[in-house]
Amino acid sequence: MKFSGNWLRKLVDLQYSDEELAHKLTMAGLEVESVAPVAPFFDKVVVAQVVSVQKHANADRLNVCKVDVGTQSDGFLQIVCGAQNVKEGMKTVCALVGARLPELDIRQGKIRGVESLGMLCSAKELGLASDADGLLELPGDTPVGVDFRKYYSLDDCIFTLKLTPNRADCLGMFGIAREVAAITASELDLPEIVFVNPVIEDVLQIRVEEPESCPLYCGRVIKGVATDTAIPLWMSQRLERAGLRMINPVVDIINYAMLETGQPMHAFDLNQINQEICVRFAGENEHLLLLNGERLTLQKDMLVIADSSKPLALAGIMGGSESGVTNTTIDVFLESAFFSPVVISGKSFKLGFTSDSAHRFERGVDFSMTRSVLERATALILEICGGKAGPVTEIGNDLPRREAVRVRQKRIAKILGVDFSVELISEYFQRLQFSYTIAGEMFYVVPPAARFDLVIEEDFIEEIARVHGYDLIPARLPKAPVHMLAEPETGVSPVKRLRQILTAKDYQEVINYTFVDTQWEADFSGNDIPIRLKNPIASHMDVMRSSLFGGLIDNLQFNLNRKQSRVRIFELGSCFSKEGDEEKEVENLAALCSGSAYPEQWGVPDRDIDFYDVKMDIESLFWPRSVYFELALHPALHPGKSARILIDKKPVGWIGELHPRWQSKYHLSQSAILFELRTEALAAELLPAMYPLSKFPPVRRDIAVVVESDVSVASLLETMHLEKDRSISEISLFDLYSGEKLVQGKKSLAFRILLQDSEKTLTDQEIDRAVSQLVGILERKFGATLRS
């Protein structure tokens, strides 16, 4: 929202500089993005009239002009000028001798032998434009001799507010003025809106078929309007400084009324309306040529303003080109309405364009001003363009009801940490122009019609804080009773525990969008039917992810492109999948490791991280439970270096090296090891049990067995752990051999067995029996034989 600082000062009696005001607004929650001067500094620049123009005797492209600046008692100034558009009788801007312009100072001198006593200026030379075709030409009624800077109000600045969507009330000068008056405790002086008495009886029938979408519609006929007149200088300046361009006087006036009040309006050419105005939803196969030149095929959920035969405008968004006011329009129909934010919201995004009207209606406008704005625009049109106004037709239905909200004095003190008296709270509500009643220490406050953001008690408490000043609320530590409660060890958040474990293992957490590229889903998940977004924030983020792999690989690419070769990252996030017609959301944990296994260190030999390093990290996440891995294929992973992760024989995730195909496709200079797990599998914690240390010596035995080469070590270990003798405390693999000394298709596995009893020293017979039992299990289940 852009506006003129001078305009604001007409509405509020301010005692603050522009910079002070910008700071106060920002501190109160209305962020001032910039405060820019309308024009750079210059002085001794006046309005002048060119009396005569003669060719320079010594230069073909120069003219010698006699110029009336209104201050020369002895005649006119002689000025040499090279502008192509200089002509006799024109009014322009003259910098007198001694004037200081943005890029030069004006001195008396001779140009090609002819004395020049000043300079006729272009907009560029005054710093008012970045380029210019010639002299700045002024309207014919501009008085000669007046100070140009003062007459055109160039000692002004343009405020740019960065409004949040909830503050639609500040999309008009009246709303901004109320806000400024409340924050600064200044006097508000809004112009009085006088209702115009009709002088003709012409009316247009209005029919509202969708009262829920259009609870209030006001319209009026004005005949005999002169669209060839110019709007006043003060109005054009305010519009230009708000970033609006001039179109024609009627459109300029309704734009001004919108800028002033925040209520959008529309003007129709009365002669283009057939019989009536009807507010309805679009029908099938209806089209509308909009003011922006786009021909629109209307959808059934689009509210339109129509006559008896065709749509005329897209309600609350943009008018139609065929029914719009032009320079030949004589009779107009003015519209001022309140359209429900629900019916307007999202339409601009869907259509691919927006408008000042849609921007306001989708956030909510002040429905109490709908009729008043129509009267304000009518008065300005009659004053500037002439014409005769008919009576107002008003169709009103169920407008939004603003219920009183209870605001408690004690609640204010609790939320803000400051005690406010009833008198001070009343003062702040009065400054905010809230209607309220008091019952003891309770206020019952009715929010204004323009404030759709005030719904609950805390909203009003925030308003008190804003008016009081956030910077004036003292910082105090909260006081709360502290009771140290015993927390069960299993009560620790599993997500917190996972973060602690992974960060302790030198991983860094990343957070990626849940919206990803369709190609990622195909490459890394083999998902051909991802959940698609109707309104993606970008074309390459059009589906919901079913795996975290894509984001991590993108993070790896980002780091490698910036010479970061050692990458250890993890992400905890939601993944989405479709099962039939049902869409499901699950929480996953994924990690990626690439590059060196350890940070660079002179005493440690450098090596790349491998599958087994990451496998060990996974085992630490599940400890003290046992994790099993089985060879399996995954679309994202290397077919010979990938495995499914199992807990209690149930699949809970994947681990593996990135598939070489994707390493090549995504231009990765090095590969990576990845894993992904369901966090629900990690949430079921087992507390480690306490066992007393045995006082008796342990015994170690080694066995080597020969099995088929396709038998997995994991299955051997799992079987041995399940069926071993109670005296065996540990079993671990310490050697694997396959070669010439074995039959082809066989491999040798050497296991180290630790035996220990907590109650006695084991005898040789007990040890031999336990080891023999273990070998027997392997012979029966896997056809293993002892290696001699």
Swiss-Prot record:
One of its GO terms (cellular component) is phenylalanine-tRNA ligase complex. CDD domains: PheRS_beta_core, tRNA_bind_bactPheRS. The keyword Metal-binding applies. Mg(2+) binds at D453, D459, E462, E463. Its cofactor is Mg(2+). It is an enzyme of class 6 (ligase). One of its GO terms (molecular function) is magnesium ion binding. Pfam families: B3_4, B5, FDX-ACB, tRNA_bind, tRNA_synthFbeta. Residues 400-475 form the B5 domain. It is found in: Cytoplasm. Transmembrane segments: none annotated. Its main location: cytoplasm. This is Phenylalanine--tRNA ligase beta subunit. It comes from Nitrosomonas europaea (strain ATCC 19718 / CIP 103999 / KCTC 2705 / NBRC 14298). The lineage of its organism: Bacteria, Pseudomonadati, Pseudomonadota, Betaproteobacteria, Nitrosomonadales. The gene is pheT.
